[in-house]
């Protein structure tokens, strides 16, 4: 039986924006037409498959993962990226707190559309 907190539920986008600033922005951009940094630009993330941001050099693991990004796949990925996609080059250790993942995903839904 699934526990509450095992999947995405809408969070606070303002808190998610702060998390993005402190935990993600050094490697990612969200703006339409924004460049890639260490990690890919995240604009258009929702509905896109792993390893598909044009012009970004992904690992084979990311290209072959066959995951379509949505709220629940991101929820699982952001808990522990290297466990979700073994071989990813994303160095981020993850967000263990359910609320933080929900807040960040809510922000990403708004900022990457």
From Swiss-Prot:
Keywords annotated in UniProt: Electron transport, Heme, Iron, Metal-binding, Methylation, Mitochondrion, Respiratory chain, Stress response, Transport
Recorded hits in InterPro entries, A to Z, give: Cyt_c-like_dom (IPR009056), Cyt_c-like_dom_sf (IPR036909), Cyt_c_1A/1B (IPR002327)
Electron transport is among the record's keywords: yes
Q: Name one GO biological process term.
A: mitochondrial electron transport, ubiquinol to cytochrome c
The record, for SUPFAM superfamilies, names: Cytochrome c
Give me the residues that bind heme c, please: 24, 27-28, 90
Its cellular-component GO annotations read: mitochondrial intermembrane space
Q: Which GO terms describe its molecular function?
A: electron transfer activity; heme binding; metal ion binding
- Describe the PTM: Binds 1 heme c group covalently per subunit.
Broad class of the protein's primary localization: mitochondrion
The chain residues annotated with the modification N6,N6,N6-trimethyllysine are: 82
Name the Pfam families on file: Cytochrom_C
Q: What induces it?
A: By oxygen and heat shock.
Compartments (UniProt record): Mitochondrion intermembrane space
Q: What top-level branch of life does the organism fall under?
A: Eukaryota
In the record, the note on similarity to other proteins reads: Belongs to the cytochrome c family.
Reported function: Electron carrier protein. The oxidized form of the cytochrome c heme group can accept an electron from the heme group of the cytochrome c1 subunit of cytochrome reductase. Cytochrome c then transfers this electron to the cytochrome oxidase complex, the final protein carrier in the mitochondrial electron-transport chain.
Q: What is this protein called?
A: Cytochrome c
What species is this protein from?
Emericella nidulans (strain FGSC A4 / ATCC 38163 / CBS 112.46 / NRRL 194 / M139)
Lineage start: Eukaryota, Fungi, Dikarya, Ascomycota, Pezizomycotina
Q: What gene name is given for the protein in this entry? A: cycA
């Amino acid at each position: 039986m699934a526990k509450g907190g095992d999947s995405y539920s809408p969070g606070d986008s303002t808190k998610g924006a702060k998390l993005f600033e402190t935990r993600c922005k050094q490697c990612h951009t969200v703006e339409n037409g924004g460049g890639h940094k260490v990690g890919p630009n995240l604009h258009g993330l929702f509905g896109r498959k792993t390893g598909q941001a044009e012009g970004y050099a992904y690992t084979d693991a990311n290209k072959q993962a066959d995951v379509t990004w949505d709220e629940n796949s991101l929820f699982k990925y952001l808990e522990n990226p290297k466990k979700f996609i073994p071989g990813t080059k994303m160095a981020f250790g993850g967000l263990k707190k359910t609320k933080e993942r929900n807040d960040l995903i809510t922000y990403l839904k708004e900022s990457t559309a």
